[in-house]
């Protein structure tokens, strides 16, 4: 670990969050991920990892716009590792413990490229199959990464939200104004030179439904590395207009699995259905 690198070792938020999880999901001295760092275009990208050279497959896990890599490592990365997989949880630039390159204005397109480059990096190490898992908005991100990279064996998403669709924006936005005008406002801000203006992601998005426990939500909303994070208008513009390298009608890279939460108050399944039902060339499983 680099001496000056940011680390979860002393971060308070995730430790408070894990108290809301069952005991077997909580980290301790004997059960916790290793923190790694990977340089991508001058971004010191933080990875939580459970390395296992005997694992037959790797799973790279992606957070959404209200979480970070440590949070998903607790609920999915660690449990998958216990079941014999090698898991890698990435903090995308501006989230978690990743130190963003100050010379870059990070966009959602950068997230997709970063994810694709991480797949390439892992494939350089060995030829074991790689699967992608995405939490919340990370579900659509893993589709975008797979469409760009084309070298993954399967994608798993909690949701698959195509923000280009008006119904998706209206349902997942914090209110009607942001649902109707958010994309236009972001575009206008970029056009007049305010693309670097930052707002909390909780302003345009329905972050109040991120988790169902009110006390846990307070902790996450106060955490500037996850639900309390700020993004630029340029990131927001890129997020709601991103065009995948392969549209769903032509996607033939790998099977898709939807793991829809039963009590999801933010992203109902019909939003994912509208996207997944367009995928006819690969097996699509919904749970």
Where are the model-predicted features located?
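Conserved alpha/beta-hydrolase "acid-adjacent" motif
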Residues: 265-271
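The serine-hydrolase catalytic nucleophile loop
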Residues: 65-77, 270
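Conserved alpha/beta-hydrolase
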Residues: 79-100
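Catalytic histidine neighborhood in serine/cysteine hydrolases
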Residues: 277-287
């Amino acid at each position: 670990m680099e001496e000056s690198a940011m680390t979860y070792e002393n971060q308070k938020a995730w430790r408070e969050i894990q108290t809301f999880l069952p005991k077997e999901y909580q980290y301790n001295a004997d059960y916790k991920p290793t923190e790694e760092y990977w340089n991508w275009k001058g971004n010191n990208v933080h990875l939580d990892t459970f390395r296992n050279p005997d694992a037959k497959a790797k799973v790279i896990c992606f957070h959404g716009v209200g979480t970070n890599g440590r949070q998903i490592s607790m609920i999915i990365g660690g449990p998958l590792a216990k079941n014999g997989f090698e898991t890698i949880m990435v903090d995308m630039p501006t989230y978690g413990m990743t130190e963003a390159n100050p010379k870059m204005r990070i966009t959602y397109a950068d997230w997709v490229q970063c994810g694709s480059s991480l797949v390439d990096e892992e494939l350089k190490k060995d030829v074991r199959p790689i699967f992608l898992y995405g939490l919340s908005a990370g579900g659509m991100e893993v589709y975008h990464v797979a469409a760009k990279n084309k070298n993954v064996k399967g994608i798993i998403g909690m949701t698959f939200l195509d923000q280009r669709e008006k119904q998706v924006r209206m349902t997942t936005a914090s209110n009607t104004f942001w649902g109707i005008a958010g994309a236009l406002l972001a575009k206008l801000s970029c056009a007049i030179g305010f693309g670097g203006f930052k707002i909390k992601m909780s302003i345009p998005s329905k972050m109040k439904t991120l988790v169902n426990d009110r006390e846990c939500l307070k902790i996450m909303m106060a955490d500037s590395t996850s639900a309390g994070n700020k993004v630029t208008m340029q990131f927001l513009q890129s997020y709601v207009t991103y065009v995948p390298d392969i549209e769903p009608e032509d996607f033939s890279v790998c099977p898709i699995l939807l793991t829809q939460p039963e009590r999801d108050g933010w992203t109902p399944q019909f939003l994912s259905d509208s996207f997944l039902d367009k995928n006819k060339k690969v097996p699509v499983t919904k749970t």
